[in-house]
């Protein structure tokens, strides 16, 4: 085999060879106004000179069809279809089916009955005369006619919005397919197409009815696993996942692996945006269920989905917004994993920048910015605005909320407080209506120690439910009963009994100098610049009050 032959085999999969042959040898079936060629039939069936009269009637009738005079064309073609010439009768029946198909586009009366009758007559005539007409020619003609009357919905995802697909049309297509069943087994390509179209329309019927699409897979006969069928089965599992938010079944993983293998072997399949979007989103579904979640890989897969949808031209759909949301969530999670130096602002990417004025991007920006700034109230508002996507992306949202609380605890609360009650930490870590229980907080703190993410040492006083942050044990300052508010002020400044002991016997001036130095060091070491600003705004009167408190000790 030469290098050219090998390259052609690589470029063309087995599933595509049949379609290529149809376009090359049976071009008369690919369009309504193209000339009849059917070279295969002419080679197999030499034309009889006596058929010239029938031939002339056929082309005159075809001219009427080309002038959109469908009713007159059907009447003229009926005369050819009932003639004693099998070839011209077969061609006339094909043209009648085309006429009815175009009359259907004009919403004419009797469209469904006319199409069904025309298709059944074409099939019966082809089977009766297939020996004389040539089985290959008959099968190609039936395949192209069936594709015309029952077009595939390959441009729409089963799980996404599809306003142009309606239930009555799907049900008519199923009746049309049932009318020509069963098909002869020796017409393998026709049988494969029939089974594939029937499965597709059954899936769409269940989807438009709001039922579970995967139930059809167990009821319908197992189809031949072509690339088109594989994509259909994969869409069923994705539809079920988005609808019920349940982890995909084992069969789903097998379908993903099969599609990935085929895409690696077939360049034509790998260049289909619909197929690659399905593959990338399926990998996102698998990644979200893994522990730990591969955030960088998820970010890559969601980005591939967005690029594929841009190629398809899906400018406004739930599925596009879902992938947009997943991409930003994965980027935020990767940010938390310490990859800040290698990050690219997600909102600077072209796919998102062109949508910057849309509500979904505004909501995602609020979520992202509040997460980075550890502003949990704003973070909670953003979560509420993204409620339509929280069930499908539940693992990512749950992980982001957990990381937001973890970062808030160790980056904002622990450096700022020397002693704080567990109840106060629970209040500070509340995200909207989702509160953190005492046991969950203690678990979070213990996990921080075990994972070395606890940036500040701490001690727990479980008798009084206090947490002491810092390198050395600290005890709260004792405030006189007449001045209970001083205790809170001391805690906000990080003053404890460990700070008070060196001040015993000191002058007020020395005390103020030590307090100022201690405060400046704390402000410069704060992890969050907002904390330093907050401390710097404490009034000088607080120092004087605390000085009196410490001297009283």
Curated annotation (Swiss-Prot):
PCI domain boundaries: 298-474
Disordered, as annotated region: 21-47
Quaternary structure and partners: Component of a COP9 signalosome-like (CSN) complex.
PROSITE patterns attached to this UniProt entry: PCI
GO biological process terms, semicolon-separated: protein deneddylation
Entry keyword set: Cytoplasm, Nucleus, Signalosome
Cited InterPro entries: 26S_Proteasome/COP9_Components, PCI_dom
Name recorded for this polypeptide: COP9 signalosome complex subunit 10
GO cellular component: COP9 signalosome; cytoplasm
Location in the cell: Cytoplasm; Nucleus
Keyword Cytoplasm assigned: yes
Biased composition (Acidic residues): 21-46
Role of this protein: Component of the COP9 signalosome (CSN) complex that acts as an regulator of the ubiquitin (Ubl) conjugation pathway by mediating the deneddylation of the cullin subunit of SCF-type E3 ubiquitin-protein ligase complexes. The CSN complex is involved in the regulation of the mating pheromone response.
Presence of keyword Thylakoid: no
């Amino acid at each position: 085999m030469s290098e050219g032959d090998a390259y052609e085999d690589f470029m063309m999969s087995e599933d595509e060879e049949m379609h290529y042959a149809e376009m090359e040898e049976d071009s008369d079936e690919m369009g309504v106004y193209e000339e009849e060629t059917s070279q295969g039939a002419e080679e197999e069936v030499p034309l009889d000179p006596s058929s010239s009269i029938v031939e002339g009637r056929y082309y005159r009738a075809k001219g009427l069809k080309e002038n959109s005079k469908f009713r007159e064309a059907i009447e003229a073609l009926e005369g050819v279809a009932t003639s004693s010439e099998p070839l011209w009768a077969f061609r006339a029946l094909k043209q009648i089916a085309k006429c009815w198909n175009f009359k259907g586009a004009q919403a004419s009366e009797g469209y469904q009955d006319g199409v069904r009758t025309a298709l059944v007559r074409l099939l019966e005539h082809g089977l009766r005369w297939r020996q004389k007409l040539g089985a290959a020619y008959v099968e190609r003609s039936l395949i192209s006619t069936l594709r015309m009357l029952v077009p595939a919905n390959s441009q729409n995802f089963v799980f996404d919005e599809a306003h142009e697909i309606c239930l009555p049309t799907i049900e008519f297509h199923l009746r049309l397919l049932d009318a020509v069943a069963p098909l002869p087994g020796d017409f393998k390509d026709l049988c494969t197409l029939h089974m594939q179209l029937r499965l597709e329309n059954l899936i769409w019927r269940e989807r438009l009815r709001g039922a579970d699409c995967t139930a059809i897979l167990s009821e319908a006969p197992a189809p031949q696993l072509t690339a088109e069928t594989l994509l259909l089965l994969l869409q069923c599992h994705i539809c079920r996942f988005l609808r019920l938010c349940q982890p995909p079944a084992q069969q789903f993983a097998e379908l993903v692996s099969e599609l990935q293998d085929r895409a690696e072997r077939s360049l034509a399949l790998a260049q289909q945006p619909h197929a690659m979007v399905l593959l990338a989103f399926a990998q996102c579904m698998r990644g979200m269920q893994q522990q730990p979640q591969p955030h960088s890989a998820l970010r890559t897969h969601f980005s591939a989905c967005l690029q594929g949808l841009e190629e398809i031209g899906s400018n406004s759909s739930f599925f596009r917004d879902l992938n947009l949301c997943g991409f930003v969530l994965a980027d935020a999670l990767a940010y938390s994993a310490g990859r800040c130096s290698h990050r690219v602002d997600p909102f600077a990417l072209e796919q998102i920048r062109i949508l910057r004025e849309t509500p979904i991007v505004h909501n995602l920006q609020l979520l992202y910015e509040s997460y980075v700034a550890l502003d949990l109230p704003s973070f909670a508002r953003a979560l509420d605005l993204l409620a339509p996507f929280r069930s499908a992306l539940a693992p990512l949202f749950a992980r982001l909320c957990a990381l937001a609380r973890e970062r808030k605890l160790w980056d904002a609360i622990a450096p700022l407080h020397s002693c704080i009650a567990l109840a106060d930490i629970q209040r500070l870590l509340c995200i909207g209506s989702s509160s953190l229980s005492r046991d969950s907080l203690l678990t979070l703190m213990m996990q921080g120690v075990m994972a070395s993410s606890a940036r500040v040492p701490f001690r727990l006083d479980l008798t009084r439910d206090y947490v002491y942050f810092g390198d050395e044990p600290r005890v709260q300052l004792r405030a006189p009963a007449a001045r209970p508010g001083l205790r809170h002020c001391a805690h906000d400044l990080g003053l404890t009994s460990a700070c008070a002991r060196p001040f015993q016997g000191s002058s007020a001036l020395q005390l103020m100098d030590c307090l100022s130095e201690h405060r400046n060091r704390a402000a410069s070491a704060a992890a969050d610049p907002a904390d330093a600003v907050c401390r710097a705004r404490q009034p000088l009167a607080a120092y004087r009050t605390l000085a009196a408190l410490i001297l009283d000790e």
